[in-house]
Amino acid sequence: GSIFTANSTRFDKDRLVYPLSYYMEYLAMGMKYDIPEFLGMCNTIFDIIEEKKIPSPECLIYLMLHPEYRSFEYEGRYEQPDFARFYEDSGILRARKGHYSYTVMREKSNFLYFHNGTSKLEMKVAGSFCEHRAFKAETMEILADGTAHLHQTMKGWYYLPFEEKPETSDWWKMDQSSRKKKLGPDMEIDVYVKPAEGGIDVRVVTDGVSGAPWRVELAFSGIEFMASEHVMLPVNGSEVLVIKDPELEAYNEKDSLLIGPGFGEHRFTEGKEDSEAKTPGAVTVYFTDYTAFD
């Protein structure tokens, strides 16, 4: 019932927001144009309020000014349909099937969000290569089978020494722009997010650079336990794990997420300077390998 805000450019970015403030708009438009989905959403909003024990929208003034609102009755509820929609200009794919949904985004390091009821997963592909610290797709397309294909070319380069000795020994006063650059190699990263039975398949392909320690970062929110073939752990949101087991279950008393297969070829999970921080309050799981990998 909450609104997806990870791509917001406003004050509500990454906040937990419910559609309470839209109640009057749904009611007015639903009544005026006889739109059952809008009227059902009005009832669904109050179902959310009762379930979450949160304050109701401030609508008293509207009910006082419009007697027709006070006398109107509607019994239905809004039933969320399955859908998959790609907003090409924004670079966002939103999809829902049953009670799980997912979002894929271009130009975001947290490029994948997967919600299953009360549990949430965020995914990054991260590592250090020149000035780059994480994968941020430059392009995004939807293939014929519904797969989201994201791609980034990370340009490799470094400064060559000064051709002539600088007049100063102060690094910050040197004319760095006068130095020539050694270009290459480039790292190519492709990510494929494919709809699958009961969830999604994610494929990560790196190429062009050999031996760089990169990682797939999975941040879990709303979970209480993690279990694999060899361990079951209660979690509180501060844990950091590298998982090599074939399958990992992250769950609470209502919902669960199954992830796998795991792989762990190194323990370099912190990244270098300027690496992005972990998601606050989330359990962080890593799958790690050296480039190039698939």
Predicted regions and their residues:
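Beta-strand-rich recognition/accessory modules
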Residues: 219-221, 235-237, 242-294
